[in-house]
């Protein structure tokens, strides 16, 4: 700090000449007056010095506080201290947070359950191999984030969040050989689901040991074998209690979409499925998310969407694996950003497997037909050889196809890239309809009702489905027959091959090639 206490430089006076003594006297007097004035100025300055020091100290402390405040995290909150974290992580949501089994299923007066039909997805599992590689690569950006905060003094994460991130190491579930394997939480998901169902429907699911057989309980799984076994163990105490039906690679019941050329064709998906998703990703809402996350982590440029995706995958997988702890990577996002990421995935599946494409409603038809056929048999003859429980295990696309066919959780307004703010209360939320261990359960009842003694109750994630035309979720069988009967009895998947697009062209090209070859053979070539 410069101070106004510097002395007046000495005045050079030459006495070599023969100037008069009067001039010398005048100069000496002027010099003395200057010194006197400087002394007075110095005295005045010294008298105000304590006040100046106080003000200067306050300013310096303020600057230090500002620097410290920025380092501590100049954002809304510290995630490590969050008492109410956002738990809805789209298709990677832990079933523990969304199922309705915390309360008992409602009792249907004057009715008894006679059959249960269920389609469930796999429980909490490890990432795919591609996702494992993506999450494991986060160690590099983690080190950059720490460097940004600790060395460069930029970034806005709080110290506790940084400490948690510093201690983070890739989990054992991120080993390549564990790809898509069921985790202990996934095993628990399925066991507890089975036990809750058994507790709510003892007439169906608490049989004598001699009645536990494949004729009374039908099991079938495709790509969810261990989930099925865990459910069976929770139900009957053994993973091998019932011999399941064999499932084939091209299973048109449990995975109809995988046998559909039009659905899988990249060009067809690009034209229908990805347009709204891509528009949302390049739009202002998502790009603002990328910008804010990048600055929060201390980057002066926008990090790539791949990095955003990797951090989001780490956040939601780790939360699903261990429901009682928080993932350090969730601290990267605030609640609104997690809602945006959730909507992005909802948008993707809306067109991939839901109401965004007409073909998806066709692909859920085989499962609807199977359910209706079982109920039809038992409605006409309760003494038929129908099993008491039918339990299928597949993936979220097949479940979403079935929900679409049945019109469950359909919004009046389609989801688009531009409706995020308008669809906060949307029905199509993958967090709630297709989390880990998601399920649709239908229970057929025989009732003492003069009007219709056959009724059906639907449960989605163990919560009653509120169907128009049904009473608090309880549907008359005659109503369901009129609603689904014609559709379920006419499940044609020829749409997968005759619809315009690459698969149809491929078929025509194949016929043309075979015809040309046939002609060449006839001509002797």
Annotate each language-model stretch with its function:
Residues 1-3, 48, 521-525:
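A positional/structural detector of protein chain ends, strongest at the extreme C-terminus
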Residues 4-8:
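Phospho-regulated RS/SR low-complexity segments
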Residues 15, 20-21:
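Acidic, serine-rich low-complexity intrinsically disordered regions
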Residues 31-33:
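Compositionally biased, intrinsically disordered low-complexity segments enriched in Pro/Arg/Gln/His
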Residues 43, 496-513:
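C-terminal GPI-anchoring signal of eukaryotic secretory precursors
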Residues 51, 115, 217-220, 392, ...:
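Transmembrane alpha-helices of multi-pass eukaryotic membrane proteins
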Residues 57-82, 519-525:
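N-terminal signal peptide
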Residues 67-501:
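Signature for phosphate-centric chemistry
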């Amino acid at each position: 700090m410069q101070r106004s206490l510097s002395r007046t430089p000495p005045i050079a006076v030459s006495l070599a000449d023969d100037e008069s003594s009067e001039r010398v006297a005048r100069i000496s007097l002027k010099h003395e007056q200057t010194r006197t004035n400087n002394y007075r100025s110095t005295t005045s300055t010294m008298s105000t010095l304590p006040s100046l020091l106080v003000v200067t100290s306050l300013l310096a402390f303020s600057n230090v506080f500002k620097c410290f405040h920025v380092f501590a995290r100049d954002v809304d909150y510290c995630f490590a201290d969050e008492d109410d974290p956002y738990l809805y992580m789209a298709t990677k949501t832990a079933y523990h947070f969304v199922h309705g089994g915390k309360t008992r299923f409602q009792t249907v007066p004057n009715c008894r359950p006679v059959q249960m039909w269920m389609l469930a997805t796999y429980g909490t599992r490890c990432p795919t191999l591609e996702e494992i590689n993506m999450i494991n690569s986060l160690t590099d950006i983690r080190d950059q984030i720490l460097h940004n905060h600790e060395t460069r003094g930029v970034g806005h994460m709080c110290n506790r969040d940084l400490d948690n991130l510093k201690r983070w190491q890739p989990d054992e579930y991120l080993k390549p050989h564990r790809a898509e394997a069921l985790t202990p939480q996934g095993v628990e998901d399925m066991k507890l689901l089975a036990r809750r169902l058994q507790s709510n429907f003892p007439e169906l699911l608490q049989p004598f040991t001699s009645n536990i057989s494949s004729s009374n309980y039908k099991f079938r799984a495709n790509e969810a074998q261990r989930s099925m076994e865990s459910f069976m163990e929770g139900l009957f105490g053994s993973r091998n209690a019932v011999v399941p039906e064999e499932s084939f690679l091209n299973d048109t019941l449990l995975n109809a979409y995988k046998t559909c050329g039009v659905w899988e064709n990249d060009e067809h998906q690009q034209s229908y499925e990805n347009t709204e998703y891509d528009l949302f990703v390049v739009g202002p809402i998502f790009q603002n998310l990328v910008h804010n996350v990048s600055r929060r982590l201390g980057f002066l440029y926008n990090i790539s969407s791949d990095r955003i995706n990797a951090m989001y995958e780490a956040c939601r997988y780790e939360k699903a694996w261990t429901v009682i702890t928080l993932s350090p990577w969730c601290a990267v996002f605030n609640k609104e950003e997690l809602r945006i990421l959730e909507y992005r995935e909802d948008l993707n599946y809306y067109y991939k497997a839901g109401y965004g494409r007409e073909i998806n409603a066709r692909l859920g038809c085989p499962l609807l037909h199977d359910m209706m056929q079982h109920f039809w048999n038992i409605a006409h003859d309760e003494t038929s050889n129908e099993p008491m429980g039918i339990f299928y295990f597949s993936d979220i696309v097949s479940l979403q196809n079935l929900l679409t066919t049945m019109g469950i959780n359909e919004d009046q307004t389609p989801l688009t890239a531009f409706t995020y703010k308008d669809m906060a209360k949307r029905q199509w939320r993958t967090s709630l309809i297709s989390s880990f261990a998601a399920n649709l359960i239908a229970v057929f009842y025989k009732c003492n009702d003069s009007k219709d003694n056959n009724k059906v109750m639907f449960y989605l994630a163990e919560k009653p489905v509120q169907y128009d035309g049904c009473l608090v979720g309880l549907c008359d069988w005659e109503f369901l027959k009129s609603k689904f009967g014609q559709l379920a009895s006419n499940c044609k998947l020829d749409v997968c091959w005759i619809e315009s697009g690459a698969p149809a062209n491929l078929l025509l090209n194949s016929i043309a090639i075979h015809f040309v070859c046939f002609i060449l053979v006839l001509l002797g070539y």
